[in-house]
Regions:
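Family-specific signature for flavin-dependent thymidylate synthase
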Residues: 1-225
């Protein structure tokens, strides 16, 4: 898994804003032009907007992230319909990036949750070894069949049916407003999200915090209150 910021709205010099945080406050003050360039109080205004659910100013800036993951996780990500996506096409290009996954146990109380193995437990270590061996065997067979199909002239869009989605790597670009990113990160960092997806959301939130520190602090403070 890897996440990187590849694009971010940048305020023009005419706004007098130095940061994206300040630009959100600038847009929020559209009805108060005499105070629109008051960057000093921008953090306080952002905190107020978040606390009281005034989200429209956060739609004035957008971010695009590059996400490298597996296709089963990307299927979960693209369900967030307020975003725009571009994803690696298995119809157009040959898949040659694969990943062996870790073993986790099913949570019997929550079907959407898994439980980490205890590697001090001999039984759990054997479970992990069997799972790793099974994946290696499946992947070797699938890759051999996939490559043979391509050599026989089978179209990529058909040959991809031979590949296990949970081990097939993909890259996608995910673009959305800051409002959408806040909602996505809140939802997907919470309990009930698959661990691999939650790790992506955590990384996205960390990146957002680097560029919107006042926003991140206000959201985190609200969630922890």
């Amino acid at each position: 898994m890897n996440v990187a910021l590849v694009a971010l709205s940048k305020p023009s010099a005419s706004t007098g804003c130095n940061t994206a945080d300040e630009f959100i406050a600038y847009c929020a003050r559209v009805s108060n032009p005499d105070n629109q360039n008051n960057n000093k109080t921008a953090p306080g205004l952002l905190k107020y907007l978040i606390k009281h659910g005034h989200w429209s100013p956060f739609e004035m800036v957008s971010l695009t992230m590059e996400i490298q993951t597996t296709r089963d996780i990307s299927h979960q990500i693209v369900r967030h319909r307020s975003f725009s996506f571009q994803e690696f096409s298995q119809r157009y290009a040959v898949t040659n990036v694969f990943q062996i996954r870790e073993a986790r146990l099913q949570d019997e109380k929550n079907r959407q949750n898994s439980i980490a193995l205890d590697y001090h437990n001999n039984c759990h270590r054997r479970i992990n070894e069997r799972f790793q061996m099974a994946q290696t065997k499946v992947l070797r067979t699938a890759r051999d069949a996939y490559e043979s199909a391509l050599e026989d002239g089978i179209a990529k869009e058909q040959a991809r049916a031979l590949l296990p989605e949970g081990m097939s790597g993909t890259t996608l670009y995910m673009a959305g407003t800051l409002r959408s990113w806040i909602h996505y990160c809140d939802l997907r960092r919470a309990n009930g999200t698959q661990q691999e997806h939650a790790e992506i959301a955590e990384r996205c939130w960390s990146i957002i915090g680097d560029h919107f520190p006042s926003v991140r602090k206000a959201v985190d403070d609200l969630n922890n209150s």
